[in-house]
Amino acid sequence: WAGFGQPGIEGHWAFEEELYLGLCWRWRNIPKPTMVEVQGRVIAGGLMLVWPFDIIVASEDARFSDPVVAFGVNGVEYFGHPWEVGVRKAKEMLFTGEALTAEECKALGMVNHVVSREELKEFTMKMAKHIARQPMLGLKLAKQSVNQMQDAQGLWPSLQAAMSLQHMGH
């Protein structure tokens, strides 16, 4: 029914839609707060692994890029670029393939905190423990409220539309 196991584009599309877009969407909607710590380079598919998280803590040496326009596609399958860094910066990021620094991403709202690599784990764990002490229902409702605001702004249909265009580049 979903196209898995089908030959050609039908099977390929079903696989990528589920593996890339579907999993990222489900991670985004986990009813508990999620955090990720990032160091080094986050390239293309790496963005899809961090963008669904609620809080991103990056080391000072972290760099974020999506150079896949050079391969003839619009960007990674979970096309969160305009939502994560804004429209103009998303275009620059995609058109040039150049990396954004952790500090740039913090200024754009994509990264919550930038710390030294030595402090990364301790800082992230301290914040996670602080959040874990909050009432679970309040956390769930707060996360759901923010996610629903993005949904009302059209995040999901935008991701689906970009995914369709991404397949044209294959």
Language model: regions and residue ranges:
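N-terminal glycine-rich phosphate-binding loop for ADP-containing cofactors
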Residues: 53, 155-169
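CoA-thioester-processing core
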Residues: 22-29, 37, 43-94, 123, ...
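C-terminal long alpha-helix characteristic of the crotonase
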Residues: 57-62, 111-160
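Well-ordered beta-strand positions
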Residues: 54-55, 92, 96-98, 104, ...
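Short alpha-helical scaffolding segments that buttress acidic/His motifs in well-ordered protein cores
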Residues: 93-94, 142-145, 162, 166
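Terminal peptide-recognition signature
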Residues: 33, 50, 105, 142
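Short, structured loop/turn "capping" segments at alpha-beta junctions
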Residues: 87-91, 100-107, 135-139
